[in-house]
Regions:
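Class II aminoacyl-tRNA synthetase-like tRNA-binding/catalytic domains
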Residues: 2-119, 129
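Short, solvent-exposed loop/turn segments at the edges of secondary structure
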Residues: 121-125
Length: 130
């Protein structure tokens, strides 16, 4: 579905009020999520080294945004677009017991995302795994 904004659309909140609401939710949501689902917070990577298999390509056709890292001999890194594999690795690394899990605030870029009213190239989402 392409981006669609009705001609008679009016925002319910002023832009600064919307930003305050987003900030409020980003402050209270993780605590509630962690308590209810027995999760601990972990910091997500913004990028991972190419070729490690950590950057989950979702359906097999996504092209990762990548760049060379000079101090690693120009090895390439990829901006994450999914943390599915990374989260499962962290569950094992931290030896998180069954019934418990982890969550993160993932920031990603999905260059091949089909853009519409709810999908963007930039992704800012809560992500969790148990």
């Amino acid at each position: 579905m392409p981006l669609f904004i009705p001609e008679d659309y009016t925002a319910k909140l002023a832009p600064e009020t919307m930003e305050q609401a987003i900030t409020y939710l980003k402050e209270i949501f993780p605590d509630m999520l962690a308590r209810r689902l027995r999760l601990r917070r972990v910091t997500a990577p913004l990028f991972v080294l190419s070729g490690t298999g950590i950057n989950d390509d979702l359906n097999g056709v996504e092209r990762a945004v990548s760049f060379p890292i000079r101090d690693l001999g120009d090895r390439r890194a990829e901006v994450v677009h999914s943390l599915a594999k990374w989260k499962r690795m962290k569950l094992g690394t931290y030896k998180i017991a069954p019934g418990y899990g982890l969550y993160t605030d993932m920031n990603a870029i999905r260059a091949d995302e089909e853009l519409d009213n709810i999908h963007s190239l930039y992704v800012d989402q809560w992500d969790w795994e148990r």
